Amino acid sequence: MSVWALFAFFSLFLSLSVRGSAEQCGRQAGDALCPGGLCCSSYGWCGTTVDYCGIGCQSQCDGGGGGDGGDDGCDGGDDGGGDGDDGYLSDIIPKSKFDALLKFRNDARCPAAGFYTYNAFISAAKEFPDFGNTGDDLMRKREIAAFLGQTSHETTGGWPDAPCGPYAWGYCYLKEINCQPYCDPSSNYQCVAGKQYCGRGPIQLSWNYNYGLCGDDLKLPLLQEPELVETDPVISFKTAIWFWMKPQSPKPSCHAVITGNWTPSAADLEAGRVPGYGVITNIINGGIECGQGGPNAANEDRIGFYKKYCDSLGTTYGSNLDCYQQRPFGYGLSGLKDTM
């Protein structure tokens, strides 16, 4: 056998061996993460080139640069401790990790500086036992990453060349700029004279019907005193987690979507609404951001926060991160408004 024939034989053997071996990461390998922070390709293999870290990458798509503590002061690890939260969610997101992910929330340039505390987050979360506590650790971390990703976009103070990048500036804002009444007179929850129901808190709760329904469920006078969402940090976080956990037909809850407990109907599938982070964007602001056929800045920002937080917490992204091809839930239904 010639040298070239031997070379061809061994090349074919190596190719078949690699193709025949088990995938290393992602959905092909039980949502496993690559060692050393390597990217997981769409096909379930670990590496650092654009083939692994580019389009379709499933996790750790910065190629190992995030979440492990860099010398630029932009990434922070956690110390593995409970940080005084009595163990609730501390195995998923201790205080040190919360502080690292929301690094600039207390910066003097942020209007919400000093408001969004870890203790307020934990106190509010305890009122919703399934929040961050459904499924295995990867799923639990994914839910926290998704919640913080969406709410960080809603409250971001970042800009493209901001210190540590745009995704270090979540939870910078507390109240919508140029607050408007946001009063729907057709709602069962009639507006109180002189009150404004503009976006407030992590999820930017908006409209009188959301304040009213949320207030009923939480047993708080939010319709009469919407300002509570911007003056009490525990209440503020409660409204955000309430919205996350609450299905409002025809929309499922964000919690059900991210934990894999939502099954799309035939109408959902026809509208392109399939399980994944993108449907959560549709739930929150689909009428403005979804169904445009291609990328938009708001979607990209939500996804950017989510990927950063998934990488830092050590979980995978899942599929269907955007809603570019999804029709909004309210499409063709008179009277149905976006909730944000």
Curated annotation (Swiss-Prot):
- Residue ranges of the region described as Spacer: 64-85
Q: What EC number(s) are associated with this protein in UniProt?
A: 3.2.1.14
Q: Which InterPro entries match?
A: Chitin-bd_1, Chitin-binding_1_CS, Endochitinase-like_sf, Glyco_hydro_19, Glyco_hydro_19_cat, Lysozyme-like_dom_sf
Q: Write out the entry's keywords from A to Z.
A: Carbohydrate metabolism, Chitin degradation, Chitin-binding, Disulfide bond, Glycosidase, Hydrolase, Plant defense, Polysaccharide degradation, Signal
Q: Which residues form the active site?
A: 154 (proton donor)
Spell out the disulfide connections. Answer: 25-40, 34-46, 39-53, 57-61, 110-172, 183-191, 290-323
Known PANTHER family for this protein? CHITINASE 12, CHITINASE-RELATED
Q: Which family does it belong to?
A: Belongs to the glycosyl hydrolase 19 family. Chitinase class I subfamily.
The name this protein carries in UniProt is Acidic endochitinase WIN6
